[in-house]
């Protein structure tokens, strides 16, 4: 069974959106990726409307089973946090109207799931997203790569109900993060 996840890296100026199909063996394939941009010159209500309209279109077009949204975290710039929170609210409401579950993931969770380290930088995340999805070129801008990383993270952490890679923890077809995750899950199963 394939799980379709729509990942959203919320932002008021740039909102990354990515759709990924993930198989039970954790093989992930990009379906679509994009960024919804709004101008700071526009009023807040119009900016949120642009994001809401785009999210509605993506939900209708790609019919994801779940949304993975980056959890808002505290930053020094309050206006940035507010914009991210407002964009997140629009996205979550769009999913709720359709009865689509929403999962929130912290940036550290996403980095750890994709790269194996919760303190990785954006370049490392983009590089591994490109490898995991077998893309010819890295998704740009970083908001697009982050949206795909969110979708991958959700599917690998909670989504598919699968027991990790059928190719086994030592497989060379897995990234270091996938191998570490597979080994941890295998160890947890043995401990039961």
UniProtKB/Swiss-Prot annotation:
It catalyses: Endonucleolytic cleavage at a junction such as a reciprocal single-stranded crossover between two homologous DNA duplexes (Holliday junction). Residues 163-176 have a biased composition (Polar residues). Its cofactor is Mg(2+). Residues 182-192 have a biased composition (Basic and acidic residues). Gene3D superfamilies: Ribonuclease H-like superfamily/Ribonuclease H. It is an enzyme of class 3 (hydrolase). Homodimer which binds Holliday junction (HJ) DNA. The HJ becomes 2-fold symmetrical on binding to RuvC with unstacked arms; it has a different conformation from HJ DNA in complex with RuvA. In the full resolvosome a probable DNA-RuvA(4)-RuvB(12)-RuvC(2) complex forms which resolves the HJ. The RuvA-RuvB-RuvC complex processes Holliday junction (HJ) DNA during genetic recombination and DNA repair. Endonuclease that resolves HJ intermediates. Cleaves cruciform DNA by making single-stranded nicks across the HJ at symmetrical positions within the homologous arms, yielding a 5'-phosphate and a 3'-hydroxyl group; requires a central core of homology in the junction. The consensus cleavage sequence is 5'-(A/T)TT(C/G)-3'. Cleavage occurs on the 3'-side of the TT dinucleotide at the point of strand exchange. This is Crossover junction endodeoxyribonuclease RuvC. It comes from Pseudarthrobacter chlorophenolicus (strain ATCC 700700 / DSM 12829 / CIP 107037 / JCM 12360 / KCTC 9906 / NCIMB 13794 / A6). The gene is ruvC.
């Amino acid at each position: 069974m394939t799980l379709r996840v729509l990942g959203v890296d919320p932002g008021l100026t740039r909102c990354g959106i990515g759709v990924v199909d993930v198989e039970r063996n954790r093989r992930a394939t990009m379906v679509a990726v994009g960024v919804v941009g709004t101008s700071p010159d526009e009023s807040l209500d119009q900016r949120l409307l642009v994001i809401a309209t785009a999210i509605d279109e993506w939900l209708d077009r790609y019919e994801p089973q779940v949304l993975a949204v980056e959890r808002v975290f505290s930053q020094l710039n309050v206006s940035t946090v507010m914009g991210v929170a407002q964009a997140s609210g629009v996205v979550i409401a769009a999913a709720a109207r359709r009865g689509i579950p929403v999962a929130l993931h912290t940036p550290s969770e996403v980095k750890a799931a994709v790269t194996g380290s919760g303190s990785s930088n954006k370049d490392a995340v983009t590089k591994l997203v490109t490898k995991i999805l077998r893309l010819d070129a890295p998704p740009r801008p970083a908001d697009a790569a982050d949206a795909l990383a969110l979708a991958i993270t959700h599917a690998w952490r909670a989504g598919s109900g699968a027991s990790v890679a059928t190719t086994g923890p030592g497989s060379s077809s897995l990234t270091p993060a996938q191998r570490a995750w597979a080994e941890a899950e295998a160890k947890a199963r043995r401990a039961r």
